[in-house]
Amino acid sequence: MLDQKELLCLLQLASPILPVGAYSYSEGLETLVEKGIISNSASLNDWLERSLCQGSIRLETAVLLRVYRCFCQEDFTKLNYWDNWLSATRETAELRQQSWQMGRSLLNLLRELAPARDNLPEQANYATAFAIGASHWQIGEELAVLGYLHSWASNLINAGLRLIPLGQTLGQSLLIGLQPSLLTATADIISLADENLSSWSWGLSFASMNHETQYSRLFRS
């Protein structure tokens, strides 16, 4: 049975009101909408489904899992290795800065909420900071992975609501429809070996590169 305190901690860590600035990023979605590649709920759903199956979010969350285990074991050398490894996979300045800014904000929050912790890094990627928070609050690794993926999907759907635009009810329908894919991605990530860490996300990379010079922008990525 799911522990109630564990559930509450997960809900807080994955909350859309977590003060990390997630709402200001679209991860290339703004460019894809401007170019007509994503124009309705079906094309947005297809983008999210494909990302969960083979995109960078899958790789990012797999690193989160490894950082989680390192923090539980207090293996900070290996934790830093995986955090640096994740930074190296960010293919544009926008995506790297997004990850660093959100990670820094979450670490600052964790210092306020858990002042007894004296082993938090000064800077880390968002996935790293999320893993540290999940470990500190004793959220199980599978729930941490699922919560991170759900938070990511919620944020991009919210961006889609404003960009396409879509109605709120349709956005909620999209999120419910993603549940099987979120569960499948979680199971796949849990079983992924180090030598199989990879992603197929050139579409995201090109969208992000184009976004850096886009004339009119609502989002920072």
From Swiss-Prot:
Keywords: Chaperone, Cytoplasm, Nickel insertion. Pfam families: UreF. Transmembrane segments: none annotated. One of its GO terms (molecular function) is nickel cation binding. It comes from the Bacteria. Coiled coil: none annotated. One of its GO terms (cellular component) is cytoplasm. Its main location: cytoplasm. It is found in: Cytoplasm. InterPro entries: UreF, UreF_sf. Gene3D superfamilies: Urease accessory protein UreF (1.10.4190.10). PANTHER family: UREASE ACCESSORY PROTEIN F. Required for maturation of urease via the functional incorporation of the urease nickel metallocenter. HAMAP family: UreF. UreD, UreF and UreG form a complex that acts as a GTP-hydrolysis-dependent molecular chaperone, activating the urease apoprotein by helping to assemble the nickel containing metallocenter of UreC. The UreE protein probably delivers the nickel. Belongs to the UreF family. This is Urease accessory protein UreF. The gene is ureF.
